[in-house]
Amino acid sequence: MAIRLHQSDADFEARFAALLAAKREVSEDVDSTVRTILADVRARGDQAVIDYTARFDRLPLTPETLAVGEAEFAAAELAVEDKTRAALTLARDRIRAHHERQKPQDDRYTDALGVELGSRWTAIEAVGLYVPGGTASYPSSVLMNAVPAKVAGVDRVVMVVPTPDGVVNPLVLVAAKLAGVDELYRIGGAQAIGALAYGTATIPPVYKIVGPGNAYVAAAKRQVFGTVGIDMMAGPSEVLILADGANDPDWLAADLLAQAEHDTAAQAMIMTDDAALADAVEAAVERQLKTLPRGETAAASWRDFGAVIVVDDLEAALPLANRIAPEHLEIAVADPEPLLAGVRNAGAIFIGRSTPEVIGDYVGGSNHVLPTARSARFSSGLSVLDFMKRTSILRTGPEQLRALGPAAITLAEAEGLGAHARSVAIRLNL
């Protein structure tokens, strides 16, 4: 059973703090192994990647067969049902339309002194996308990562996906084609991250790597950071639902289980001011668990990390929700706008009873790559801006240099940087 908390209980704060502090993911100590793999890939390039792929994925490759070819994309198209392809296309189009609105504008202006300032936005030239492999890999994640990159103007989107025993989900290939992925390689693990970061004879390096992966992939991303950029260190999925008593408990239970079925370490939580609804939701969760194909996974998640929190009123839930800073926040109340105004920390917010979080996973248009493990307190979900760089622009003419130069010289001398001061003074004949 999920943990049950009542805000009116004397030990509520201690138990709530323990809920926040609970560690949901056991990190394997893989840094040493990953460091060895990365060094090997950096030294031996293609051959190291091929050797590790044979060892871990049981797939013999050559430099010529690292890339997925057009014949395989064509076969994947034939293997995917028309209605599924149409759904992927709808999702792609909605993601593209929403992310087009995120594109920033260049800014140039001249201030009162006549100094010209501004900012210029340019796309990262090459981005790598890691997609977990096997038949359980998610085509929606391909769209969520690759489409914003292409909207940003990235010239070269390179996708890597492990194919254990040669198996790859055809939906992933179709999604890659729809999203505009430029290159796709059948490699995974830390060795794929190394190939993207350092490059090989077959795979030119990229400048940033995005996408989720296991402990080895996460460690590899951490270790190559600085050589390349990375997106975020994502953990298990989570949802928090703020609900009033007028909700259908079966709807809420379905939303909770939609997160719980992801992973035994996923977390599904609900806050309500109605104890009777809390009871009904718990009962509905138990009923629905018996019918789910991934019921065993969802049951473990609900048992170990689920939470039902009864608050004095929904306004009192807001400070608690902001402390949780959930990846996904559903506001399932009659009038959600006042509560929405008080939300400071959440990866994404789903407003009203008719907006289940799952719509955001697939076809809403907003991005489902979101901060987890309370990192929504200081970070945002994936967007077009993650694939762009802002460069400052400054121009001073002779008059502006005469006006500003003496102050620059004074500050440079105060910092003991004589060459800095001379750089300005020499232009002013000082």
Predicted features and spans:
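N-terminal Rossmann-like NAD(P)+-binding subdomain of aldehyde/semialdehyde dehydrogenases
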Residues: 1-125
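Flexible, glycine/charged-enriched surface loops at secondary-structure junctions
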Residues: 104-109, 229, 266-271, 291-302, ...
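Conserved small-residue-rich beta-alpha loop and adjacent elements
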Residues: 109-174
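Short internal beta-strands
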Residues: 155-164, 268-274, 279
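Conserved NAD(P)+-binding/catalytic subdomain of aldehyde/semialdehyde dehydrogenases
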Residues: 180-267
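A glycine- and small/hydrophobic-rich beta-loop-beta segment
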Residues: 262, 270-346
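C-terminal core of ALDH-fold dehydrogenases
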Residues: 323-430
